[in-house]
């Protein structure tokens, strides 16, 4: 399904001219571009001190083309992409059956990733991708959407707070023997009648 989002529509603002990008469901042919986009955004966000072996291995293990190829055929995963002229600008990845003990009770889904290339931040892509992710989660019966952003990703924490997500405590993300604090953010959703 292709969804064209009018500027401002995703935030409930006055509708302006149509942007030159659109949202659509990812397909298996997107795996390569999703992989590279994810690596780029991850490194821009988390490798602020440069690249070291632990980060390099984590990126190659978590964001390979094969990882995305598998996700795109998984029954409990949905990926929505923002595209312009055949180029991916960002994506949202949902795990429809994921649960977290710190998230509010009820049927849950996880926003595993919401990544937008840096040149396109501020262009409402993140807002539109999040709105679509919330809609998909609701359509699949989730009453709660949760995510775990890094505690030092202040821009992401503020982005989600402005969109109604509340902090439910700390969790750890561990790779290569290193643990990094993340926050559990969650938002209650109205379950869609399509569920």
Please name every model-derived segment.
Residues 3-9, 16, 21, 25-31, ...:
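Acetyl-CoA-dependent GNAT
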Residues 147-157, 174-179:
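Conserved beta-strand-loop-alpha-helix junction that forms the acyl-donor binding cleft
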Residues 117-119, 123, 151-152:
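Active-site acidic-Proline motif in GNAT/NAT acetyltransferases
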Residues 164:
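Short, structured active-site-proximal loop/turn typified by the sulfatase FGly-forming signature C/S-X-P-X-R
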């Amino acid at each position: 399904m292709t969804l064209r989002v009018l500027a401002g529509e995703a935030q409930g603002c006055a509708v302006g001219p149509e942007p030159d990008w659109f949202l659509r469901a990812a397909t298996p042919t997107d795996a390569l571009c999703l992989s590279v986009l994810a690596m780029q955004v991850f490194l821009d966000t988390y490798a602020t001190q440069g690249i070291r072996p632990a980060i390099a291995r984590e990126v190659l293990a978590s964001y390979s083309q094969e990882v995305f190829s598998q996700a795109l055929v998984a029954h409990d995963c949905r990926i929505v992409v923002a595209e312009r002229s055949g180029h991916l600008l960002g994506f949202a990845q949902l795990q429809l059956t994921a649960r977290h003990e710190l998230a509010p009770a009820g049927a849950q889904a996880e926003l595993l990733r919401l990544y937008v290339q840096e040149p396109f931040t501020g262009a409402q892509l993140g807002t539109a991708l999040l709105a679509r992710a919330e809609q998909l989660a609701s359509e699949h019966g989730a009453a709660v959407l949760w995510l775990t952003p890094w505690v030092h990703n202040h821009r992401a924490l503020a982005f989600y707070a402005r969109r109604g997500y509340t902090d439910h405590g700390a969790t750890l993300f561990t790779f290569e023997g290193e643990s990094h604090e993340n926050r559990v953010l969650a938002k209650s959703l109205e379950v869609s009648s399509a569920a």
